[in-house]
Amino acid sequence: MKAAELRKLSIDELKDKLAETRKELFDLRFKHATAQLEKTAEIPAAKHNVARILTILKEKGA
């Protein structure tokens, strides 16, 4: 998700999105560890999404 799209969300929606993205990252890491993940580039992409969400939450003062 792009930063501009994330900035339009409310603080509660961002927190929900953060939890969802962190769970996705956990699942990706688990799949990678068990050799079930084919697209390993999804892990850094999920990390970047977490960082984007955290940055926007800090900008909004949450």
From Swiss-Prot:
Listed GO MF terms: structural constituent of ribosome
Source domain of life: Bacteria
InterPro entries in the cross-refs: Ribosomal_protein_uL29 (IPR050063), Ribosomal_uL29 (IPR001854), Ribosomal_uL29_sf (IPR036049)
Annotated Pfam families: Ribosomal_L29
Keyword Metal-binding belongs to the record: no
One of the GO BP terms on file: translation
Keywords from the named record: Ribonucleoprotein, Ribosomal protein
Keyword Ribonucleoprotein: yes
Gene3D superfamilies assigned to the protein according to its UniProt record, in alphabetical order: 1.10.287.310
Family statement drawn from the similarity comment of this UniProt entry: Belongs to the universal ribosomal protein uL29 family.
NCBIfam families: L29
Stated name of the protein: Large ribosomal subunit protein uL29
Species name: Oleidesulfovibrio alaskensis (strain ATCC BAA-1058 / DSM 17464 / G20)
